[in-house]
UniProtKB/Swiss-Prot annotation:
Function field: The replicase polyprotein of coronaviruses is a multifunctional protein: it contains the activities necessary for the transcription of negative stranded RNA, leader RNA, subgenomic mRNAs and progeny virion RNA as well as proteinases responsible for the cleavage of the polyprotein into functional products.
One annotated GO molecular function: mRNA (nucleoside-2'-O-)-methyltransferase activity
Protein known as: Replicase polyprotein 1ab
Pfam families in the cross-refs: CoV_Methyltr_2
Residues forming coiled coils: none
Keyword Transferase set for record: yes
Domain annotation Nidovirus-type SAM-dependent 2'-O-MTase: ranges: 1-128
UniProt cross-references to PROSITE patterns, sorted A to Z: NIV_2_O_MTASE
Top-level taxon of the source organism: Viruses
Record-annotated membrane-spanning stretches: none
GO biological process, one term: methylation
Length: 131
């Protein structure tokens, strides 16, 4: 995402992950680049309130303009504020029909990661927001 290249629905989609963050790679006086990183997509099992994507982008712009960033080369998953801790997490292949309350609870606690479930969405070139 940047100030001018973003998608409302991408912001809304990222909130359906149990853990998510923005990894900001470049900030100067006129521009920034951020990558939305999500771990453990819950989709319809997400019980969090979803904030409108336009508001999320406004919050990103406010944060970007009010935060002095130091240069760093840390991995996004190593940052202390990112609450997902994947130590000793089991990684499994599961189909949607195999999900139950216990599995979802393990996902939420970072004790289980699910892989190889195929492509979720393809936005194509729709990342550009045009007025």
């Amino acid at each position: 995402i940047t100030e001018f290249s973003w998608n409302k629905y991408l912001y809304e989609l990222i909130q359906r992950f149990e853990y998510w963050t923005v990894f900001c790679t470049s900030v100067n006086t006129s521009s920034s680049e951020g990558f939305l990183i999500g771990v453990n997509y819950l989709g319809p099992y997400c019980d969090k309130a979803i904030v409108d994507g336009n508001i999320m982008h406004a919050n990103y712009i406010f944060w970007r303009n009010s935060t002095i960033m130091a240069l760093s080369h840390n991995s996004v998953l190593d940052t202390p504020k990112f609450k997902c801790r994947c130590n000793n997490a089991l990684i499994v292949n599961l189909k949607e029909k195999e999900l139950n309350e216990m599995v979802i609870g393990l996902l939420r606690k970072g004790k289980l990661l699910i892989r190889n479930n195929g492509k979720l969405l393809n936005f194509g070139n729709h990342f550009i927001n045009t007025p």
